[in-house]
Amino acid sequence: MIKGYLTKSLYKQFYLSGKEKALIERGDIYIHDLRDMILGCINCCLFDIGHVLKGGFEMSNVQYSEPKSVLSALQVIGDITLVATAQQFGGFTLPELDKVLLPYVEKSLAAARAKYRDLGLDEDTVERVASRDVVRELEQGFQSLELKLNTVPCSRGDFAFTTITFGQWNPELFTEEEREWLMTISRIMLQVRRNGHGKDGKPVVFPKLVYLYDERQIEADKWSAQLFDEAVRTSSECMYPDYLSLSSENGSVSEIFQQYGAITSPMGCRAFLSLWCNEEGRAVTVGRCNIGAVSLNLPIILKLAQLRHPDTWRNDFWRILDERLEFIRSFFKKRYDIIRNQKCSSNPLAFTQGGFYEGTKSPDDRVGDLVRYMTASFGITALDEATYLWSGRRLVEEGGDFSASVLRHLKEKLAQFKKEDGHLYAIYGTPAESLCATQARQYDRFCRDEGVENVFRSTEHYSPEYFTNSFHVNVTEDITPFEKQDREFTDFHLCEGGHIQYVRLDNPENFEAVKAVIRRGMKKGFYQGVNFDSAYCGDCGRHSTNVLFKCPHCGSANLSVISRVCGYLGYSNVNGMSRMNDGKMAEIRNRKSM
């Protein structure tokens, strides 16, 4: 914390202009992860773990041989994750991990078969016991990975925000045995998550799990269909996995998959890379990264226009918004230049060992042209509150016209910036984990300084303690999961650089209901999650749902409660304490449809 405070202060002092600092202090814009900017490192990434493992690699001046079993592969992946995440900030995704692990399953299987054949066992017995041994390796490997990612902080001092995506394969390119093992890899990973850890099976929150949903694949392949049901079962107990649609008629992720065959896995809780094709016209997703996010405080910008230009504020809002976008653009251009001139030794696993696309440079080389495939995110929050200031109605009442007009305006401006600057810019539906409270406080302070009323202090459905997450409807809306999906459809697809759609479930134990919500989200092209509060009682050891403070079985307050923070899960209550700020906790208490 001390280091973060120091680096944040130094960056503000030496890297930001006076105008940038003024806008940050008032709250018009928010530079995410400001404490890490001075280090010149990248943000979220889709790390090419398969490329790093294949043939061996070097880490911290030690040569690693390629793993000879799936157990050692998972153990080494855990080590790589802890080291690589210390060289960046933000989300670290291991994309399509099931397919990465398949060759190591085959190595383990071959070794086990040879061992049991040497013992003179018949072939049926050899297959049975060899498969049993490999399943046990998978169990131990995923248990080891979960324990590392939930108990061992990286050298930056925090836990690696890791995501694993899985579940997509082309049935025509894999044999029956390979498809069964692909299913088994993911089934064991899901089973380990459901079982939790320790004698009482206490749940964990990392890594985030994302199922890659291809409807045609599920219909054509029995192993895919079995895995989808296993995933839904796990979501109904653990909330994860979330689901990414690859086969919808809607959305850029599905479009890229269907046109290029490339999967754009999410990073962090909701970030997505922009489409980028190499010189041969191939869409490259794995091995790319983001350089950071800067978010707008739309309510402050709107209120500023209303106060400074009371007669023409509806026109002046767009002008002021464009000015703020230019500031963000200028900041990102500086970020691209800083990263371009970094030495590759600043992130050796990514830039010298193949973790990133073309990342096989020498340590003393500059990152250079690798920045051409990196994305920068223009973030938006509080579209619900902004809609109220614009129209006097909540987003669900107004119908989403204003929010869509804002996002379309951003999309047009970013297309212009991209053409002029040659950089990949994207609209990011900011998750606002703690920012939900920060921006609300900034708006409240701005109103006090200007001597005007903060309407969110006295208006039903709103709170001065927090702003609504990105484009989502107000958490207090009493609407059904299907209604929420419909209300957020347009804005979700306009925020191509960062989005997730989630619905709150009162009865997650209803498997068919959970499955119906997920399938509907997949038809709509969503990155879909389901929400409920998952509680574990430290006294009676029983699990409950949608409980925050008191065990319904024994009355104990000794609870560990996992809630959806925004796009990812976190502990909202551990024995009466929470790491979330007061604003986020107020939002969690008010949830009806989030």
Per-range role (PLM):
Residues M1-R372, L389, R393-S560, G570:
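Conserved catalytic cores of very large enzyme subunits
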Residues F549-M594:
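Long insertion/accessory domains within large nucleic-acid-processing enzymes
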Residues G379-A382, G497, G567, G583:
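Glycine-centered flexibility sites
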Residues A376-L389, R408, R564:
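Contiguous, well-ordered alpha-helical segments that form the cores/surfaces of helical PPI scaffolds
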